[in-house]
Amino acid sequence: MPETIENQACIVIAIAGASASGKSLIASTIYKELKEELDSNDIDIISEDAYYKDQTHLTMDEREQTNYDHPDSMVHYLLVEHLRQLKQGKPIQIPEYDYAKHNRKTSSKHFEPKKIIILEGILLLTHETIRNEINVSIFVDAPLDICFIRRLQRDLIERGRSMDSVISQCRKTVRPMFLKFIEPSKQYADIIIPKGGKNRIAIDILKAQIKQLLSKK
């Protein structure tokens, strides 16, 4: 379990769920609204995607065969180390990821500790040591067919993917890994948000919970 909130430099809110379930939308909505309501810059977002393994040693064809929905595709020990450093009030260097090249960039992002850290990613609740660093865990629940449509649109427009590659990946790894790892991790969530990223009531409840936690610091 996380240490007492009063002794932490930051509060960690984790938002997990299927790929394209609405995690990023909820994270960005909470970020923007709390930043305005609290009149504070002391809130930021970390994406689990930044912690995909470096694949410089692989060819592009080999990278395209990587199972990016399996926990082994991530360097989770580094994410845990970074969360602990942030909670101690120390800055970190977050890796940066290139979706088109399926690999880390050579650059990294300097990240200062904030009072509120919103962590979003598909596999966050599958890893016990990450769960132990989380103060509030959320699982965004959305129908898989809706997630597939959103992912197809997103990857074609934002990530430079081909339609065939997205469809193949969803069939071979995304759906099977969701059923094997991600959906079972829902049991570890403090809050389950149905209807994806546009659930206004759930967002307001989550914001109220974060404000309550802040009042204890």
Swiss-Prot record:
InterPro entries, A to Z: P-loop_NTPase, PRK/URK, Uridine_kinase, Uridine_kinase-like
Chemical reaction(s) catalysed: uridine + ATP = UMP + ADP + H(+); cytidine + ATP = CMP + ADP + H(+)
Signal peptide extent: none
Pathway connected to this protein: Pyrimidine metabolism; CTP biosynthesis via salvage pathway; CTP from cytidine: step 1/3; Pyrimidine metabolism; UMP biosynthesis via salvage pathway; UMP from uridine: step 1/1
Compartment(s) of residence: Cytoplasm
Primary enzyme class: transferase
Organism, as annotated: Haemophilus ducreyi (strain 35000HP / ATCC 700724)
Gene Ontology biological process terms from the UniProt entry: CTP salvage; UMP salvage
GO molecular function (one): uridine kinase activity
Major subcellular location class: cytoplasm
Name of the protein in its database record: Uridine kinase
Keywords, comma-separated and alphabetical: ATP-binding, Cytoplasm, Kinase, Nucleotide-binding, Transferase
Family recorded in the similarity comment: Belongs to the uridine kinase family.
Binding site for ATP: G17, A18, S19, A20, S21, G22, K23, S24
EC number(s) from the headed UniProt entry: 2.7.1.48
Cellular-component GO terms for this entry: cytoplasm
Keyword Plastid appears in the UniProt entry: no
